[in-house]
Amino acid sequence: MTQHWPAGEIARMILDGFDDYREHFRRITLGARERFEQARWQDIQRAAAARINLYEQKVGEVNGWLRDAFDDEVLLEVEQWPLVKSAYIRLIDPRLDDELSETWYNSLFCSLFSHDQISDGCMFIHTTRPSIRSHQRAAQTRTYCLDASLQSLLRAIFADYAFAYGDLESDVSRLEAQLREHLPDWVCKDSTLTVELFSPVLYRNKGAYLVGRLYNSDEQWPLVIPLLHREGHGVEADALITDEAEVSIIFSFTRSYFMVDVPVPAEFVNFLKRILPGKHIAELYTSIGFYKHGKSEFYRALINHLANSDDRFIMAPGVRGMVMSVFTLPGFNTVFKIIKDRFSPSKTVDRATVIDKYRLVKSVDRVGRMADTQEFADFRFPRDKFEPECLAELLEVAPSTVVLEGDTVLIRHCWTERRMTPLNLYLEHASEGQVLEALEDYGLAIKQLAAANIFPGDMLLKNFGVTRHGRVVFYDYDEISFLTEVNFRHIPPPRYPEDEMSGEPWYSIGPHDVFPEEFPPFLFADMGQRRLFSRLHGELYDADYWKGLQAAIREGKVIDVFPYRRKGR
C-alpha cells in the first residue's frame, strides 16, 4: 500500500457524481410544468421513466470514473473505506440534501464490493445525519388568511399559482362549496382559519397538485387542490380535498412518483409528515421520486423493528404462489417475495423473465392499481427471527435463494411490497355491501390497468389485494405484459356438435392469444360473485372491448385516472 491512500479523492469523486445526478434529476423535474401546460402527455410518461432509470445509469457512470482513476488494488482495498466514509461525511455536512448523498454513497459502495463486505464502518447502514440539524429550515410555503371571505382566500391562492385557467370564477365557486361541505360551518367562519401551501407545485401524469394544510387555533386538515389541463379549455381547479384518507391515497405506494422541485428534500418530507402522520418517511421520499432513499429508510425501519421487537417471520396468509414464495412479519406492514427454484408446471415463465416483469413495474404508470416494489440483494437476518415452519418452507422451495449460514439466514434476492389482504380472503368474510364494493373496484382496477397499457395476465382474485383504504390493487407481476402485445380473440363457433363436448379446443391457440369469454369460470367459483361481476363489468368478457382499448393506446391516447373522488362531475 502506498503511503497516501486517496480517501479524500474517492469521496470527492463520489460526491461529484451525486451532484451530476441531482442536476439531471432536477432538469427532468423542472420540465414538468411546461409538459403539463402544453398537454404533452406522452412526453410526461417518457420523462417519468427516464427519471427513474437515471439513478442506476449515473451510479454506473461514477463506478466507471472510479475504476478509470484508481487501480483496483487501491480502489477495492475495503479496509481503507472507513477513511472514505469519514472524508465523505465532512464533505456532505454543509449540504441541504445530505441524507440523499448518504444513500448515493451506499449505492456506489455496493456497486464496487460484494454484499458480504457491507458494514456500518464502510457505509451508511445507519444515518449519521442528526435528527435536528443546525442548517434545517422550515419548508418553503405560502400562507393565506381568511381576511374577507373563502372566495377571496381562494382567489389569492390562484393568483400566486398562476396558470392559464379556463374559468377561474366557476372553479372558485365550486371549490368554496366543497370546502363548506367538508368542514364545519364554524370553521369556515373562523377568523383564524389559515391555508399553508407548499410553494412548488407537484406534477404527476395529467395533473398538477397544490399541497398543504388548513388550520385554525385548534385543529388542522390536509389540503390538496388538483389542477387539470383540459385541452382547448385551459387549466381548471378540479377539486378541493381535506380528507386525510383521500390525501393519503394521492400519495399512495400504488402511484407513480411526483415531479416537484425540492432543493431541501427533508423540508418537504417533514411538511408532508405533519399533514399525513400515518405515512412512513420512506413512502414520502419515494412519492417524490427519491425511491432509493425511500429504500434506505425502509431498511433502517426494518432492522430497527427486528432489533426492538419479538416479531418473527411467518409465511404470508393466502394461497401459496406458483412462482413466488411470500413471507412477512406480523408487526411490520410488508411482505417479502422470493422466486422459487421450481415453478408449477402450468407456468411457462423462467426466473429471468420474472425479474424483468417485476422491474418493469417500477417504470410504468401504476395508475393506483399496482403496488410499488423494492428489490434487495443479500438480506441477512438472525435465524431466531424466523418461525421454524416458515424457514423450513423457504429452504425447501428456494434453496438457491435462501441459505442457512450458522445462526444467520441469507436471502440472496427478494422484493418487498406493502402487505394487503388478498382479495379472495377478503371476500370470504365480507358483507354483501363489501362484496359489491370490492368487485366493483376489482373491475375498475383491471380496466384502469388496461387503459394504461398493462394486462395483468393472471387475473385471479388471489393476485389482487385490498388496502387499508378499501382499494383493490394488483400485486403479482410474473405474467404482466403490455396490453398491445396481447391478441384478444373471440372463441370460434364449433365446427361440429361434437366439438362442444370435447375436452380439447377445436381451434388453434397462439402464445399471446387470450379469450375473454373464458374469464367467468376462471375468475369466479362462486356463482353469486360471477353473476354480480358480470352485471358490473360484463364488457371485460368481450374481446372487442379489449381491442378498442388497444386501438386507443396505439393512437397515443392517455386516459384520465384520478387518485381522488371527483365531486359533482
Curated annotation (Swiss-Prot):
GO terms for cellular component: cytoplasm. GO terms for biological process: glucose metabolic process; glyoxylate cycle; tricarboxylic acid cycle. Coiled coil: none annotated. It catalyses: L-seryl-[isocitrate dehydrogenase] + ATP = O-phospho-L-seryl-[isocitrate dehydrogenase] + ADP + H(+). The active site is at D372. Its EC number is 2.7.11.5, 3.1.3.-. NCBIfam families: PRK02946.1. Bifunctional enzyme which can phosphorylate or dephosphorylate isocitrate dehydrogenase (IDH) on a specific serine residue. This is a regulatory mechanism which enables bacteria to bypass the Krebs cycle via the glyoxylate shunt in response to the source of carbon. When bacteria are grown on glucose, IDH is fully active and unphosphorylated, but when grown on acetate or ethanol, the activity of IDH declines drastically concomitant with its phosphorylation. Belongs to the AceK family. This is Isocitrate dehydrogenase kinase/phosphatase. It comes from Pseudomonas putida (strain GB-1).
